[in-house]
């Protein structure tokens, strides 16, 4: 007798598995985890080095023969611009530079050491710090000609230091002098804020700022410290052809020993109901006054 044919199913096949598509508005596993962090797979700087980012800062670094560059990164839309910038450099410089590596924009977003999204404009350079000059060499090269210096008394914010460097570049400052301690090292934040000035204004580091002031005074350089209780107006700075302006940290201002070593204490007149000026703004005003007498 032939077996009956029918539609009976095994009990395990009663409800076959179905493939379901996500419903509208449902959360996938990626949604639950949240958006991926920008620069999660960001490039790493070389040992003892750092990143410089932004069009002006990177191009200034490329043009500086003293700047050692490990790697160059660009996005697809800026790679050709960066290559053309390199091609325009003297051959003695361009042959020392690495080829441009095209990289996804999101990877470059996360190169900052503080985790903030980098405003890199599609250009990043991995570099090593410049060799800092000695104060004695700076003074020797200046000779007896008129010149300007800035001294920073324990300014630790790289953004402030970078902004001061930018003003120093604009007003022809020969060098900026700071201390080894309580001062920022060369880094990307400083370079980005300086907008290329890091490659033009030497950053001199000294162990003791008071002794550095004594060296300047021995070289016939007038040292003027900016202070809210200064007795001279900032316009008076223009009378000194060889001048070093000392800036203190926001809040504490100049340390006592630094104040005692200054030849003059100078103030910037502000409205009586105003608290104070940002130190980088104060530096720009002082440099302008030293140049124009205004």
Which residues does each predicted region cover?
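Conserved beta-strand scaffold positions in the cores of enzyme catalytic domains, especially
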Residues: 51, 99-102, 203, 223-225, ...
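Active-site/ligand-binding-proximal alpha/beta "capping" segment
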Residues: 224-279
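Active-site helix-initiating loop/hinge in glycosyltransferases
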Residues: 54, 153, 160, 276-278
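RNA substrate-binding interface of SAM-dependent RNA methyltransferases
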Residues: 94-95, 136, 142-232
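Short basic, glycine-rich beta-strand/loop surfaces that mediate nucleic-acid
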Residues: 111-128, 194-198, 202, 240-248
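Structured adenosyl-cofactor binding patch, chiefly the S-adenosyl-L-methionine
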Residues: 167-170, 189-197, 256-294
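N-terminal positively charged helical leader segments and presequences
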Residues: 1-140
């Amino acid at each position: 007798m032939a077996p009956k044919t029918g539609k009976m199913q095994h009990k395990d096949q009663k409800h076959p598995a179905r493939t379901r598509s996500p419903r509208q508005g449902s959360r996938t596993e990626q949604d639950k985890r949240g958006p991926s962090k920008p620069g999660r797979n960001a490039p790493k700087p070389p040992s003892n080095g750092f990143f410089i980012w932004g069009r002006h800062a990177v191009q200034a670094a490329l043009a500086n023969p003293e700047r050692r560059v490990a790697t160059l990164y660009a996005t697809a839309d800026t790679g050709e611009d960066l290559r053309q910038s390199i091609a325009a450099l003297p051959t003695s410089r361009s042959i020392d530079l690495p080829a441009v590596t095209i990289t996804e924009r999101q990877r470059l977003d996360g190169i900052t050491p503080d985790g903030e999204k980098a405003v890199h404009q599609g250009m990043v350079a991995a570099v090593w710090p410049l060799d800092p000059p000695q104060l004695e060499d700076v003074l020797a090269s200046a000779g007896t000609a008129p010149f300007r210096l800035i001294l920073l008394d324990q300014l630790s914010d790289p953004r402030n230091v970078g902004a001061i460097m930018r003003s120093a570049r604009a007003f022809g400052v020969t060098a900026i002098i700071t201390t080894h301690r309580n001062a920022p090292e060369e880094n990307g934040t400083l370079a980005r804020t300086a907008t290329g000035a890091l490659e033009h204004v030497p950053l001199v580091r000294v162990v003791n700022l008071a002794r550095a002031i004594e060296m300047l005074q021995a070289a016939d350089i007038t040292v003027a410290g900016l202070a809210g209780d200064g007795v001279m107006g900032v316009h008076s700075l223009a009378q000194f052809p060889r001048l070093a302006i000392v800036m203190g940290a926001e809040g504490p201002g100049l340390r006592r020993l630094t104040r005692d070593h200054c030849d003059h204490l100078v103030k910037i007149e502000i409205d009586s109901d105003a608290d104070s000026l940002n130190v980088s703004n104060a530096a720009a005003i002082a440099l302008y006054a030293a140049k124009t007498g205004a």
